[in-house]
Amino acid sequence: MTTDVRVLRQDDWNLWYDTLIRAFGGVAEASEERELWQTLTECDRSIGVWDGDACVGTAGAFSFRVTVPGGASVPAAGITMVSVAATHRRRGVLTAMMRRQLDDIRSWGEPLAVLTASEPAIYGRFGYGIGTHQLTADVDTSRVRLSVPPGTDDVRLRYAVPADVLDVCEAVYARLVPGRPGMPARRPGWDRLMVLDPESRRDGASPLQCVVAERDGETVGYTRFRVKPDWEPSGPKGTVVLQDLEALDPAAHAALWRFLFDIDLTSHLNARNRPLDEAWLHLVSDIRRCNLRKRDSLHVRLVDVGAALEARTYQAPVDVVFEVEDAFCPWNEGRWRLTGDGKGATCVRTRDSVDLALSVRDLGAAYLGGVSLVSLGAAGRVRELRPGALTEATSAFSSAIAPWLPHGF
């Protein structure tokens, strides 16, 4: 098979995107959804694989900046729209695209690549590690109550048309981004994704609704959600389907969650993609009836090990030599000495004795502070060659706030 990997031309976008849609089952998107993704696609950072006139592979890379421990916003390639035509599976198309992408990202000077995976087993061989997780909750709100903090009743809630309050909601989101690793700063246009509301997204629920939280005339939080009505002989059994919720303080946070718990004619709340450490978990009367499930979210790839490790800060002083294995990006292979603390870090090549040996995949998993190096060591994925080095590095890499990706891309 002879194929050609090339940068996407704007004139080829429709064919390229049709290839992607077919690979994901072939169900056409609403026109407004397709138009938005066309606007967001960065063609000069996207590639297609062509077999003659047929597009048989797709991959893109958004220009993101992602928060890392310490609060810095670090350039990261947001890998997206990856697909291979079913007619060309197991012929090296995906590997060719991953090769081209990582070479390009390195040339752009971006130390990180991140993605969400339709199938998590795919990307480990290319050096991606699972760096964040998310919670889904199915709460029986007829049986669970919230104990709210002082000041909750001082928060005013009001309904608003989602598109009409987009700017104030985005301002709340932007204030939160530096405080949580894994959160991307949303570039212009990405806010529209948050209020996209085609019928195909509703699954029998209402159009998207929005409630904003205010105090003294200032917006301090918001939630966007749908309501899915249902009735049984015993009465209403509707479900609130939460899309997103952000708040600037405990009272606003509690006020919004209490509102969602108490919506008339509903008895369940489905909350998807929430952080592992979210405060509402400590407000509920019965955690078991929240039916929590955890799953992978953001996969992290260190494209430039030295630059990536220097970009974040560390919870405790650290001075450790890593032996990094990276067969797919051999420029990362070898020994790196990381010296850092809460103020900054340096990471340079060294010939000193190795303290810890691990793959770039596992270094990526630990990078945002949500995966413990000790736990990876217990799984045999990190080898400790200097006694005490694993505990030292684990303390340094940890994050007081769980890393989280609030939305897909």
Swiss-Prot record:
<feature type="binding site">
    <location>
        <begin position="118"/>
        <end position="119"/>
    </location>
    <ligand>
        <name>acetyl-CoA</name>
    </ligand>
</feature>
<protein>
    <recommendedName>
        <fullName>Uncharacterized N-acetyltransferase SAV_5428</fullName>
        <ecNumber>2.3.1.-</ecNumber>
    </recommendedName>
</protein>
<dbReference type="InterPro" id="IPR051554">
    <property type="entry name" value="Acetyltransferase_Eis"/>
</dbReference>
<keyword id="KW-0808">Transferase</keyword>
<dbReference type="GO" id="GO:0030649">
    <property type="term" value="P:aminoglycoside antibiotic catabolic process"/>
</dbReference>
<dbReference type="InterPro" id="IPR036527">
    <property type="entry name" value="SCP2_sterol-bd_dom_sf"/>
</dbReference>
<feature type="active site" description="Proton acceptor; via carboxylate">
    <location>
        <position position="409"/>
    </location>
</feature>
<dbReference type="InterPro" id="IPR041380">
    <property type="entry name" value="Acetyltransf_17"/>
</dbReference>
<dbReference type="Pfam" id="PF13527">
    <property type="entry name" value="Acetyltransf_9"/>
</dbReference>
<dbReference type="Pfam" id="PF13530">
    <property type="entry name" value="SCP2_2"/>
</dbReference>
<dbReference type="InterPro" id="IPR016181">
    <property type="entry name" value="Acyl_CoA_acyltransferase"/>
</dbReference>
<dbReference type="GO" id="GO:0034069">
    <property type="term" value="F:aminoglycoside N-acetyltransferase activity"/>
</dbReference>
<feature type="active site" description="Proton donor">
    <location>
        <position position="123"/>
    </location>
</feature>
<feature type="binding site">
    <location>
        <begin position="90"/>
        <end position="95"/>
    </location>
    <ligand>
        <name>acetyl-CoA</name>
    </ligand>
</feature>
<feature type="binding site">
    <location>
        <begin position="82"/>
        <end position="84"/>
    </location>
    <ligand>
        <name>acetyl-CoA</name>
    </ligand>
</feature>
<comment type="subunit">
    <text>Homohexamer; trimer of dimers.</text>
</comment>
<comment type="similarity">
    <text>Belongs to the acetyltransferase Eis family.</text>
</comment>
<dbReference type="InterPro" id="IPR000182">
    <property type="entry name" value="GNAT_dom"/>
</dbReference>
<dbReference type="InterPro" id="IPR025559">
    <property type="entry name" value="Eis_dom"/>
</dbReference>
<feature type="domain" description="N-acetyltransferase">
    <location>
        <begin position="3"/>
        <end position="162"/>
    </location>
</feature>
<dbReference type="Pfam" id="PF17668">
    <property type="entry name" value="Acetyltransf_17"/>
</dbReference>
<keyword id="KW-0012">Acyltransferase</keyword>
<dbReference type="InterPro" id="IPR022902">
    <property type="entry name" value="NAcTrfase_Eis"/>
</dbReference>
